[in-house]
């Protein structure tokens, strides 16, 4: 994990987040959750050097808002004890209890920097059926929140459309797209988004006023290095038109088809019927 942090920092990133997205007592129990948060913070802190470290908290599997708030408080208290001052609540589908936990952090650590980020489909709606733009403005109106944004689910190109739908956002805006969309190849889920294309879209987002840029699912150090290079420390004067690189699909070997194409060979199909009550 430390090596992964260092790879992203070497690509030019000036902030990393702890490897604690799914850490909560509902999914792993209190003892394991505590160990994961402590290890996640310490590893990120060791790797960061002068870079910022954000305590990363994903959505809590909600039974109800009260229980979710208790889970967030448990994690937040641990991070605060460890010395965290930057917090990222990401991949959210609603604002339920998030405003309250943001105020809780602010009371405990007045110097905290808190980012609230929602996950939206390309059509503008979150998994809970709420408009991401409404959630963004709801979060922005909370005095305890420092920055708002979007992450995950959508690729960089669709993030541009989502940002266009937001209207005026007074607080700093964060966008962390996926590296395109996932495909399953050979039983593995992969993202084939080209780093240069990704960087071009990120450049457009920066020109639109997005002040905090990063990557979510499928983004590698190459994607972020290309983004850092494309930005060059300032927003472009014109929004560039970037065309994605056309990739040729790689043929997959099919032994059944190969047998059909060979003269004199016949495929043999066998049906296996398991015995009754067999396991």
For each predicted feature, which ranges?
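Domain-level signal for soluble alpha/beta catalytic cores
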Residues: 1-279
């Amino acid at each position: 994990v430390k090596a992964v942090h260092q790879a992203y920092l070497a690509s030019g990133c000036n902030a990393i987040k702890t490897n604690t997205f799914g850490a909560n007592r509902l999914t792993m129990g209190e003892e394991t959750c505590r160990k994961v948060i402590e290890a996640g913070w310490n590893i990120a802190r060791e790797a960061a050097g002068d870079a910022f470290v954000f305590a990363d908290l994903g959505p809590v599997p909600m039974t109800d808002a009260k229980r979710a708030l208790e889970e967030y408080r448990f994690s937040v208290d641990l991070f605060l004890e460890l010395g965290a001052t930057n917090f990222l609540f990401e991949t959210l589908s609603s604002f339920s209890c998030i405003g309250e936990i943001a105020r809780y952090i602010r009371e405990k650590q007045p110097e905290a920097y808190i980012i609230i980020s929602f996950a939206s489909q390309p059509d503008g709606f979150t998994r809970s059926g709420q408009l991401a733009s409404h959630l963004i403005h709801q979060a922005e109106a909370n005095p305890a929140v420092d920055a708002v944004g979007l992450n995950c689910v959508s690729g960089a190109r669709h993030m541009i459309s989502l940002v266009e739908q937001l209207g005026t956002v007074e607080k700093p805006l964060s966008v962390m797209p996926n590296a395109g969309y996932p495909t399953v190849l050979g039983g593995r889920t992969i993202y084939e988004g080209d780093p240069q294309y990704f960087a071009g879209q990120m450049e457009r987002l920066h020109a639109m006023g997005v002040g905090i840029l990063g990557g979510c699912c499928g983004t590698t150090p190459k994607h972020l290095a290309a983004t850092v290079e494309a930005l060059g420390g300032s927003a472009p004067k014109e929004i560039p038109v970037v065309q994605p690189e056309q990739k040729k699909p790689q043929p997959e070997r099919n032994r059944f088809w190969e047998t059909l194409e060979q003269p004199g060979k016949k495929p043999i199909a066998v049906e296996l019927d398991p015995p009754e009550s067999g396991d």
